[in-house]
């Protein structure tokens, strides 16, 4: 199955990490489509592409991201690339080497789409922690049992599905949430790789979560599930006591 990795960019210097991580993938039947979001960004982006062996570029004459949102590119890309599976990668994040291989294997098991878990890094690329509290997909976020979330850079979706649901990307902050909501509703056959292979950089922008958010959330989940975190140990059943003699199996 041929994979397309989609990255909209305005030349963030961190793009070099994204490029290198795609080049290092153990799964090799892939193309990294770099959508340069505005002709004014061509030169700074091209200076970072030297040596990137998987790249094809698409130059947009006008900026459509309005600063740093690339969701309009994600919405349109499924109609523009030649691939069986689409992965999305923000320009300031990156993948572990086995990321795409694990996602493809999961889809080959019969799923329409799949997602990974993620690791959290500071703005300089230093590892902080695993995210075991927010981007969990099937399992709710730590602060609200009604809310589920998957980060943009964790998805892998069959292109045929992405074409039918791509419009759900259209939006600004929180578009990954509305995409997940629509994708899981219309294509409920999906699964998690149970591996933290997406690398998420905390960048300190006004909408960015903090290290303290994950510290608190991971602590809450540890108290809730103990050592048997179900997204890391999918074969284990976890029981939560919700009343005298009453246990909820998850």
Language-model regions, residue ranges each:
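Conserved donor NDP-sugar-binding/catalytic core segment of glycosyltransferases
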Residues: 101-129
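Short beta-strand/loop segment that forms part of the nucleotide-sugar
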Residues: 30-41, 58-62
């Amino acid at each position: 199955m041929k994979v397309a990795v989609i990255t909209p960019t305005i030349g963030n210097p961190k793009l070099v990490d994204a490029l290198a991580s795609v080049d290092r993938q153990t799964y090799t039947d892939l193309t990294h489509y770099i959508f340069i979001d505005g002709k004014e960004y061509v030169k700074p982006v091209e200076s970072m592409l030297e040596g990137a062996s998987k790249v094809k570029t698409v130059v947009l004459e006008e900026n459509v991201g309005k600063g740093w949102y690339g969701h309009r590119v994600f919405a349109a890309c499924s109609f523009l690339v030649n691939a069986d599976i689409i992965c999305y990668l923000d320009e300031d994040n990156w993948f572990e080497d086995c990321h795409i291989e694990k996602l493809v294997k999961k889809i080959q098991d019969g799923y329409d789409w799949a997602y990974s878990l993620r690791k959290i890094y500071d703005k300089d690329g230093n590892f902080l922690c695993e995210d075991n509290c927010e981007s969990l997909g099937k399992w709710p976020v730590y602060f609200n049992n009604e809310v589920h979330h998957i980060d943009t850079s964790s998805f892998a979706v069959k292109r045929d599905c992405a074409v039918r649901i791509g419009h759900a990307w259209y939006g600004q902050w929180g578009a990954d949430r509305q995409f997940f909501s629509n994708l899981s509703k219309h294509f409920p056959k999906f699964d998690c790789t149970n591996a933290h292979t997406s690398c998420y950089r905390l960048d300190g922008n006004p909408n960015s979560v903090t290290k303290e958010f994950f510290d608190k959330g991971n602590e809450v989940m540890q108290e809730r599930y103990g050592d048997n975190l179900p997204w890391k140990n999918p074969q284990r059943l976890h029981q939560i006591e919700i009343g005298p003699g009453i246990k909820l199996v998850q």
